[in-house]
């Protein structure tokens, strides 16, 4: 049984699978302040033996998670961006500097869609990454997420109160103006990047992240929403790890330890 962890800037998303390549048995999310709640989740799945995760929240939280996993007898692996892995080639000037969440999302998108795509992850920050038809990561954008944009206005503008607003074509109050402006800024960045993929007919915009629904309806491009793309990418990595750990069989297939069967 395998635990997948996407440790982001605000939340920890988790998924439990029976084995690599199988559907989710359970999944959910915790805030950073709720990190110790992961102990109860792990305790509910006593057969857990492995963890594959992405952590962009820093060493302190990673160390706390490592301690919990060690206590539970779970072997953990935090992924790192590579130069070429799982059908994706890393075009970053320094491949190791690419965020592990972006790397896992690119791998998940490649498995989902074999053609050219934009991988848009909207959370605390928004990333807009271009993956071409050959699996080459061509680069991407990082911009403040909607809530960071809103908070920046509130922190740096005198007399401005943050109130819930709605996205409208022609806002006529401050709350709607802020929400609409921030959402349209996100959509504009996505569409500007997507224009570089045109006229490739099979180009797709893969949307993920908790803030994506706040601007998805503004997009005029072909989109495909995915709730937890980083976890999907981690599942691909976990499956490859499992395959690599199986000893070769004389027939050329791989023998999976534990049951003697050839798969």
UniProtKB/Swiss-Prot annotation:
The record ties this protein, via CDD domains, to: ASKHA_NBD_PanK-III
Entry's cofactor comment? A monovalent cation. Ammonium or potassium.
Which enzyme class?
A: transferase
The residues the record assigns to binding ATP are 6-13, 124
Q: What is its EC number?
A: 2.7.1.33
What keyword terms does UniProt attach to this protein? ATP-binding, Coenzyme A biosynthesis, Cytoplasm, Kinase, Nucleotide-binding, Potassium, Transferase
One term under GO cellular component: cytoplasm
Query: Per its Swiss-Prot or TrEMBL entry, what cofactor is needed?
Result: NH4(+); K(+)
State any GO BP term from the record.
Answer: coenzyme A biosynthetic process
Short name of any one Pfam family annotated for the protein: Pan_kinase
Tell me where in or outside the cell this protein is found. Answer: Cytoplasm
Tell me the disulfide pairings in this chain: none
| Reaction catalysis annotation | (R)-pantothenate + ATP = (R)-4'-phosphopantothenate + ADP + H(+)
User: Which residues are noted in the entry as substrate-binding?
Assistant: 92, 99-102, 174
Q: In which pathway does it act?
A: Cofactor biosynthesis; coenzyme A biosynthesis; CoA from (R)-pantothenate: step 1/5
Describe the task this protein carries out: Catalyzes the phosphorylation of pantothenate (Pan), the first step in CoA biosynthesis.
Q: Which HAMAP family match?
A: Pantothen_kinase_3
Q: Which family is it part of?
A: Belongs to the type III pantothenate kinase family.
* Subunit and partners: Homodimer.
The molecule here is called: Type III pantothenate kinase
What is the originating organism of this protein? Azoarcus sp. (strain BH72)
For this protein's source organism, the top of the classification is: Bacteria, Pseudomonadati, Pseudomonadota, Betaproteobacteria, Rhodocyclales
